[in-house]
Amino acid sequence: MMPIPVNPTNASIQPQSLYDAWADLAWRAMLTEVNLSPKPGLVDRLNCGAHKDMALADFHRSAEAIRHWLPRFMEYGASCTRLPPESVLAGLRPLGMACEAAMFRATAGVNTHKGSIFSLGLLCAAIGRLYQLRQPIAAETLCATAADFCRGLTTRELRQNNLQLTAGQRLYQQLGLTGARGEAEAGYPLVIRHALPHYRALLAQGRDPELALLDTLLLLMSLNGDTNVASRGGADGLRWLQQQAAVLLHQGGIRTPDDLVYLHRFDQQCIERNLSPGGSADLLIVTWFLAQISQVNH
């Protein structure tokens, strides 16, 4: 892929063109994930997976609505560099909620990308902060900055004992799953240590990009304590899905178009069990986005 041309004459006075280029990558990451097919239990070009309330067009409309908010996360990240990183999240929340409202308006109330608003919002704010501080913008630095933003998040939001537990608190208390919050606070280790190196290695070997991304999704599904899956199928459902993904990888993964038959079968099994690995889908979006981040010249 050729680098995305930006060529600012003076980066300090032309950040907006850079922000738009990075936002375009994040938008493309959302589209790349939902169009990827076949995906076990997830909405794709072939079916709606284990979902009865959403379809492909909902995701396209959602991504378009979110797209316009992404530069605002970057602008906020750039505007608060004097704040300690752990103080940034409080200011990001109103932006995230407004972005969610735009998503819900676009989809008539369907939650298509709430997890991605959280992860991409964090990473876009990290881009703004690092750019303003003249620090390297790369997968590792972005994830480390996002982790700094989220310092103490799981303790504050998952370990407190409310009378009415949220879904995330319930899954944490019952199964020890920290979900999107825990992954962000840890600096996205499933992406940095596993999915991103795996995806890059497959591309370096000449693997078809779509097959490489499907194989990377399987890797994430095999490792991720996906709260979306656990909320639908409990510990047993999560364990089954992780094991099925691991078996497919052990058998060679998705190397050729002929291997797609195994994914079609896995998809039908997930639909029958009403399991949808939405958390892994969100991490796949992060993986693709970070894999492309160097394409923007800055």
Swiss-Prot record:
Disulphide bond pairs: none
Domain of life: Bacteria
InterPro entries assigned to the protein according to its UniProt record, in alphabetical order: CitG, TriPribosyl-deP-CoA_syn_CitG
Record GO terms (molecular function): ATP binding; triphosphoribosyl-dephospho-CoA synthase activity
Major enzyme class: transferase
Gene Ontology terms describing biological process: prosthetic group biosynthetic process
Transferase is among the record's keywords: yes
Catalytic activity: 3'-dephospho-CoA + ATP = 2'-(5''-triphospho-alpha-D-ribosyl)-3'-dephospho-CoA + adenine
Documented EC number(s): 2.4.2.52
Alphabetical UniProt keywords: ATP-binding, Nucleotide-binding, Transferase
Protein's UniProt keywords contain Nucleotide-binding: yes
Similarity-based family: Belongs to the CitG/MdcB family.
NCBIfam families for this protein: citrate_citG, PRK10096.1
PANTHER family per the UniProt record, alphabetical: 2-(5''-TRIPHOSPHORIBOSYL)-3'-DEPHOSPHOCOENZYME-A SYNTHASE, TRIPHOSPHORIBOSYL-DEPHOSPHO-COA SYNTHASE
Protein name: Probable 2-(5''-triphosphoribosyl)-3'-dephosphocoenzyme-A synthase 2
Organism of derivation: Salmonella typhi
Classification lineage: Bacteria, Pseudomonadati, Pseudomonadota, Gammaproteobacteria, Enterobacterales
Gene name in the database record: citG2
